[in-house]
């Protein structure tokens, strides 16, 4: 009888640990969504800012990049390129001029010793899209975004995918814990 009770308790503990134990994972970044800006550029490219530690909300910006998205006739825009060698950034009233990376798609403020966080305004200037057109990007204020997922760490350790998206959007609109 005692062995049966121990087995029953062990089974109940295992069931609760697989079904009831969830952890939240939060990943932070900076983005510009098409709805954030009324300009024409958002049809052709997106802008993304990576942090030095994407799991730390107060981490500085490591890089700001442009990337191609849907082209006007539903083809993927394959190439975007910054035309300026230096990009102007204004943060806390100071102006910085950052070199364009070798890929001609990003700037690396942290690598150049400049700490940027939310509130930085980036002046990209002109961008070439697919060697066909040149678009002027207006000044961009990057907005901090968060991607929250929940997962079961015990099941995850056993290669059982329990990951669920909880929220993805602007940090200031996130109402979770």
Language model features: what each stretch is:
Residues 17-38:
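Bacterial Sec signal peptide processing site at the extreme N-terminus
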Residues 36-46:
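N-terminal topogenic membrane-targeting module
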């Amino acid at each position: 009888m005692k062995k049966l009770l121990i087995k029953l308790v062990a089974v109940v503990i295992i069931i609760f640990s697989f079904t009831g134990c969830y952890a939240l994972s939060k990943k932070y970044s900076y983005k510009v969504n098409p709805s954030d800006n009324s300009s024409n550029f958002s049809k052709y490219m997106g802008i993304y800012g990576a942090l030095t530690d994407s799991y730390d909300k107060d981490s500085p910006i490591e890089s700001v990049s442009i990337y191609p998205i849907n082209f006007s006739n539903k083809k993927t825009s394959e190439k975007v390129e910054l035309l300026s060698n230096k990009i102007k950034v204004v943060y806390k009233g100071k102006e910085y001029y950052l070199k364009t990376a070798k890929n001609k798609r990003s700037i690396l403020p942290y690598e150049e010793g400049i700490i940027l966080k939310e509130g930085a305004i980036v002046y990209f200037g002109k961008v070439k899209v697919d060697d066909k057109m040149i678009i002027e990007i207006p000044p961009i204020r990057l907005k901090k975004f968060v991607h929250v997922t929940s997962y079961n760490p015990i099941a995850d350790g056993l290669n059982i995918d329990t990951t669920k998206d909880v929220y993805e959007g602007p940090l200031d609109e996130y109402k979770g814990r």
